Amino acid sequence: MGNTHGSKIQRKFTMEFLNNVPFNIQVPSSLRDPKDVTFSIDQLQNLQTIDDARNIALKYLHSCSNFASVWNSNTIHPETRRLMRMLIQIQTINAVCNAFYRLLDNTRIQLHADMMANAALNTKQYSNNYQYDTSRQQRSYDQRTKIFVVNGDCLDIVSCFREKYQNCSPVVLNMASATCPGGGWRHGCGAQEENLHRRTNLFQCLEDSYQQLVGKRNWNYPIPEFGGIYSPNVSVFRGSEARGYPFFPNGPEYISFIACAAYAYPSTTINKDGEMELYGSDVIHNTMKKMETILKIALDNEHDTVILSAFGCGAFRNPPRHIAKLFHKLISEKYSQSFKYLIFAIIDDHNSMKSHNQDGNIKPFADIFNEPILSLDEF
């Protein structure tokens, strides 16, 4: 009788797990080694269902040029965009779980399973009351921190930065959902966190979709209000959305991330100068506290460069000029010599030019920090 009860519990757990795996990609039974000719532009334009996206993702070699051609058109339906993103995510899961991907010429590029597993295993959650190492927090350089404001994709920027400044140790801010690992990554959503999931093995680090870390780490979501999640040496192996998510021809790069959640839809007001600001001393103080957590986690892991962004100024509708002012105040008062470089990597996308950010998100940061807006080439 006891064995029967135990078997029922195990079957229930197994079914719940199988039903929860992303896009119903079972490992290893669903994995494929796509070698066929690439998908066509017509196939992308005519995506109708998740099954369509899944079948194309697992059968065909990826053509970033075909993808970009459809993606960058003005006539594409929003639902088609969502399915195209899901197609990319399925390709990425297949690559990570296979530990390889193929280029358009059929060249097989290896992903290092041990590196990806270690990134997930060593992903660490910081609590609200985490006791930071004092000596690391007090680090100071002789020169003041150099600030850049760059119009570009955060991963493109960090790759470019590491080529130019090879002795630096950058970490990238993941503007995360507080409650849902990866935000809407399973649904083809378009914010930064979901974009990172489509280009890396972050889904292994934050969600543990395949139950590989059960009993191996002692934390869960949500992200603490004044905490964060640090993921070291995540495998990054795809380029930006605008370029069609190309697979890297020379294999993965290893980049660390800090996941921290801005407040969603905070109360705002209009100040005497006609600018939108956060409303209430508590939300202003607590937003700065969140910003400081990002910098504290970076220092705790001995990074000298942080790739930041317009924190919460997209889908979460924080006012960018006020967020820039709060970052400026925090950095100038407490962190003016704590880092070599702080880089605000910002893209004005579909969440820009709204009621809360009518001038976009890049310009307010350039104005407040009195820095030019650099392109990736200029940077």
Q: Which residues fall in each region the model found?
A:
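Macrodomain-like recognition of ADP-ribose-binding/processing modules
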Residues: 2-306, 310-379
